[in-house]
Each structure stands twice: as structure tokens, then as C-alpha cells.
Amino acid sequence: HKSSRGLGDVYKRQVFIYTCIYTPLKPITPLSVFVGAIPGAIPFMLGWVAATNSFGIEPGTLFMIQFFWQFPHFWALGWMLDDDYKKAGFNMLPTGKKDKKTATQIILYIIWMIIISIFPYSGLTGALSLSIYGAIIVLILGILMLMFAVNLYNRMNTESARRLFLFTIFYLTSIQLVYIFDKFI
């Protein structure tokens, strides 16, 4: 099948980027997270393509949600485990700079993620759509995540980073469920 071959090709590229580019960059630059966000966002997209046998704005939107989600997720983790990453020889953001600049970057990526996450309500994302109820739930979840990030910005401590990190996991799981079950409301 042509679509299976295409999915396999994308998967091979994902594995290549992760193993041959992202992993070697980890001890070199904290910017490796940007490269790693690409293969990290591909599975979300591939799930759509595998289920529908089509590629378009829908999987692209899912890719972008997952792409932007990874930054607050991994930067909160990096904030919590900075010493461990240093011991392992990895340069992860915040790279010892648990400062307002890092917290501001987290906030900005969350804002972009919120915008992209509610975009399916616009009707411009093809079969990936949200009802007003689904959009409100996704928006509330995004605002809650933003509040955790603002708390990190204000307190600048590991506990705030931990709470943000845990909420990022809850957020991603929740919005995926909203996208699925919103169709039945």
C-alpha cells in the first residue's frame, strides 16, 4: 500500500532525526530540544494519517500542538533535573539559568499552543474540528497550564516546575480525549 510506505518513510525520518541528530546534539547545545521536538511531534501526526489515510491540515495541526507542547513540558523537566542533566553531560534548558527568561519562554510557547489547540473550532482545519463545548474545555485546560507557568515565573522554584511538568502530562492526555469525544457531544 502506498500510504503504508509513506508512513514508513516518515517513521524512518523520525528515527533518523531522533537518533542521528537530536541525541548527538544533547551534550552539545540546549537547543537540541528544538530538533527533538520534530520527531517528538510526528507520532501524533502519524496517528491521524494512519487512521484516515490522508495528510492535510488536520495532522499538521496535531503536529503543531504536540510540537509546542514539548517546550514547556521538557523545560519544566529540565528545571527540575538540571543537576542530573549536567552530571550526564547534557545541556538542557534552563542550563542552570532558572530565571525569568526561561520562564518567559515557557509562557510564550504555552500561548502558541493554546492558540493552535483551539484553532479546530474555527472550522478551518478540515475533519479535525471542535464544538464550542470542546473548544471551551481545551481553552480552560490551556489557561490552567498557563497559570502553572505564570506561577513558575513568579516563584522561580523547583516545586512550581514540578507542578507545571505534571500538568503538561494531564493537559496533553485531556485534549486528546476532548478531540476524540467531542465528536459525540
List each model region and its residues.
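Membrane-interface helix caps and helix-loop-helix hairpins in membrane proteins
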Residues: 23-31, 48-54, 125-129, 158
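Interfacial loop-to-transmembrane junctions
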Residues: 146-174
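Single conserved hydrophobic/aromatic residue that forms the stacking wall/gate
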Residues: 1-11
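Transmembrane alpha-helical segments that form the membrane-embedded catalytic/substrate-channel core
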Residues: 16-21, 65-82, 114-117, 142-152
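Small-residue-rich segments of transmembrane alpha-helices in multi-pass membrane proteins
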Residues: 34-49, 100, 165-177
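Hydrophobic alpha-helical transmembrane segments in multi-pass integral membrane proteins
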Residues: 45-54, 113-120, 171-185
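Short alpha-helical packing/oligomerization segments
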Residues: 118-143
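Solvent-exposed interhelical
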Residues: 68-127
